[in-house]
A protein has these predicted regions:
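Hydrophobic, membrane-interfacing alpha helices
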Residues: 1-261
C-alpha cells in the first residue's frame, strides 16, 4: 500500500488524488477525441463539466448515506466514494443534458460510457494504493498486506476489477475496429452488463461487513441493474422505447407549457 505517492516540498501527494486526476484526464481525452471523430456538434467542456460534477457529487453523497459514521470532510479529496453513485448521477446528468440540447443520446452515451470505464479502471489502482475496498484474507501468493487494516495477506480486489475492466475495454475496442457493434446504445449495454457481473463476482473476494441476506450493497445493485437492462432490451425489441419518441414527448410537454402561458 502506498496512500502517499510522494512528497513535493513538504506537501504530501496522495495516490488516490493522483490516480483520480489521471482517470478524469484519460476519460475526457477519449470522449472528446471520439466525439470529434464522429463529427458530433456539442459543447464538449460544458457537457463534461456537468457530467463530471454530478458524478463526483453523487459518488460522495451515496457514500455518506451508506456510511454516515465514517463521514469526514477529507473524503472529498482523499477517498471515500461509491462508484455506483457517481455512475448513476453522472449518467442522469448526461442524459438530461443531451435531451435538453436534442443530441443523439445513445450514440454519445456509447462514447461517454466507454471513456468513463477507462477512468474507473485507472481509478481502481488509486483505490488499491489507498487501501480501500480491500479483500478477504488469503494464503495465495497474490495476497497483499493492508497496513491500515492488519498485516494479513488479502485479495487485491481493486486490482481484480481494474484488470477485468481493461480486458473488457480492449476486447470491445478491437471488435469496434472491425466495424462491428454499430447499433447505437449496444456498447453501453454490453459494458454495463459485463460490469455488473464483474462487480457481483468481485465482491465475494471483498471483506465487506455490510451485507444484507449474504449480499453486499454492490451485489444487490448489480442484480437490480441486470434486471433493468433485461427490461430495457425487451422494451426496445418491442418498440416501446426509442429516442425519437423520447424527444417527441419532451417537445410535446414544452408546447403544452407555452400554450398554458
Amino acid at each position: 500500500m502506498k496512500p502517499i505517492l510522494f512528497s513535493f516540498f513538504g506537501v504530501k501527494i496522495l495516490s488516490y488524488t493522483v490516480f483520480s486526476f489521471l482517470a478524469i484526464i484519460a476519460s475526457i481525452f477519449y470522449i472528446i477525441k471520439n466525439l470529434q471523430k464522429q463529427k458530433i456538434k456539442i459543447d464538449y467542456f460544458d457537457y463534461l463539466f456537468w457530467t463530471i460534477l454530478f458524478g463526483a457529487l453523487g459518488s460522495k453523497i451515496i457514500y455518506i448515506v451508506l456510511y454516515p459514521n465514517q463521514f469526514d470532510f477529507s473524503i472529498f479529496y482523499s477517498g471515500g466514494a461509491v462508484s455506483w453513485g457517481g455512475i448513476f448521477f453522472g449518467c442522469i446528468a448526461a442524459i438530461l443534458y443531451l435531451k435538453k440540447h436534442h443530441l443523439p443520446i445513445s450514440k454519445i452515451l456509447d462514447i461517454s460510457i466507454f471513456g468513463l470505464f477507462i477512468g474507473i479502471a485507472i481509478g481502481r489502482i488509486g483505490s488499491f494504493l489507498n487501501g480501500d475496498g480491500y479483500g478477504k484474507i488469503t494464503d495465495l501468493w497474490i495476497g497483499v498486506k493492508i497496513p491500515k487494516v492488519d498485516l494479513s495477506p488479502r485479495y487485491p480486489a481493486e486490482i481484480f476489477e481494474s484488470m477485468a475492466l481493461i480486458i473488457l475495454l480492449i476486447t470491445l475496442y478491437l471488435i469496434k475496429k472491425k466495424q462491428k457493434l454499430q447499433t447505437p446504445g449496444l456498447i453501453s449495454l454490453i459494458i454495463f452488463s459485463f460490469y455488473f457481473m464483474i462487480r457481483f463476482i468481485n465482491d465475494f473476494f471483498k471483506d465487506n461487513f455490510h451485507r444484507y441476506c449474504g449480499l453486499t450493497f454492490n451485489q444487490i445493485f448489480c442484480l437490480f441493474g441486470i434486471g433493468v437492462i433485461i427490461i430495457f432490451i425487451i422494451w426496445r425489441k418491442h418498440g416501446f422505447w426509442s429516442e425519437s419518441r423520447f424527444f417527441k414527448s419532451t417537445k410535446r410537454k414544452i408546447r403544452k407549457k407555452f400554450e398554458k402561458t
